[in-house]
């Protein structure tokens, strides 16, 4: 389990050019546009008779995705993305573990 704090003091490569506080969120893929060239080509190819025209990918190899942190500078609002390692469980701003304490569920 990876636990990342909601704020982080790191270098801002926008206007600030110095270490500032950044607000951390997890990157999420946006909604795909129906007007993108590949999507338009695929839709026109699929039209009419002839069934599925392109192969549907079924040989999935990975069980996890790489976590990408999206950091926004609190001063100039410049955003940057930071990929971290693969993990099955990711937590943002969870409780910090303390030494010698019993874990409660």
UniProtKB/Swiss-Prot annotation:
Keyword Ribonucleoprotein: yes
Record GO terms (molecular function): structural constituent of ribosome
InterPro entries, per database record: Ribosomal_eL44, Ribosomal_LSU_eL42, Ribosomal_zn-bd
UniProt region (Disordered), positions on chain: 23-52
GO CC annotations on file: ribonucleoprotein complex; ribosome
Pfam families: Ribosomal_L44
GO term, biological process aspect, one: translation
This protein's UniProt keywords: Ribonucleoprotein, Ribosomal protein
Biased amino acid composition, Basic and acidic residues: 29-46
Family according to the record: Belongs to the eukaryotic ribosomal protein eL42 family.
The protein's name: Large ribosomal subunit protein eL42
Organism of provenance: Brugia malayi
Phylogenetic lineage: Eukaryota, Metazoa, Ecdysozoa, Nematoda, Chromadorea
